């Protein structure tokens, strides 16, 4: 266990060295402040634009999913997560980018964060997982139109280095937390790697 914690420390310190992060969180607070659980401190590190979430940020339960938009199991679990969000008002669900499957995954991760800068991040996120069949340019364009996003601003923002850095940092934190693929979850303080059934998620809630 001590070795695992050292690995986490090395990886996340690398992220801090290489990437700009939330100035309100210091290394000392992240690793040595025991007043807050580690999974919640992850959310303090991610800049606001990178937080795609449903529910009250002060909710009693927090579910974090590291996910990829081309991950089949991420798509499978998504409606179950939305069901939990609907049924449990004491639970928030946070979706963090971990685009590992393709360059297209990285493109969509950037696009969702750019949409979040127009306050449409969660809507874009949900729409991507609700696409039937394969996602293509026509379907993507339709989502943008349906959400009434500023297409020009979206294209500019998604190429910004700050957006690239958010995605990189999120993946660093995923790897440092022990993610070996997608989806990977924190259900409160419990780390779960891989698909998890709705019943098991509910069993881990307070």
Put a short name on every predicted segment.
Residues 99-182, 186-206:
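Cysteine-centric redox/oxidoreductase cores and disulfide-bonded domains
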Residues 2-7, 16-100, 156-159, 163-176, ...:
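Extracytoplasmic thiol/disulfide redox context detector
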């Amino acid at each position: 266990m001590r070795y695992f914690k050292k690995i986490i420390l090395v990886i996340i310190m690398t992220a801090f060295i290489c990437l700009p992060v939330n100035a309100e969180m210091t290394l000392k607070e992240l690793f040595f402040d025991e007043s807050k659980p580690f999974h919640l401190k992850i959310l303090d590190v991610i800049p606001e634009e990178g937080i795609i979430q449903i529910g009250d940020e002060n909710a009693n339960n927090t579910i974090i999913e590291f996910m990829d938009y081309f991950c089949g199991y991420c798509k499978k679990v998504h409606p179950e997560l939305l069901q939990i969000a609907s049924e449990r008002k004491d639970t928030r669900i946070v979706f963090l980018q971990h685009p590992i499957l393709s360059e297209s995954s990285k493109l969509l991760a950037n696009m969702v964060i750019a949409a979040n800068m127009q306050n449409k991040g969660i809507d874009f996120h949900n729409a991507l997982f609700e696409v039937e069949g394969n996602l293509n340019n026509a379907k993507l364009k339709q989502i943008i139109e349906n959400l009434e996003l500023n297409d020009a601003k979206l294209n500019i923002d998604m190429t910004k280095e700050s957006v690239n850095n958010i995605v990189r940092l999120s993946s660093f934190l995923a790897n440092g937390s022990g993610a070996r693929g997608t989806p990977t979850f924190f259900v409160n303080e419990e780390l779960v790697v891989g698909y998890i059934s709705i019943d098991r998620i509910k069993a881990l809630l307070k």
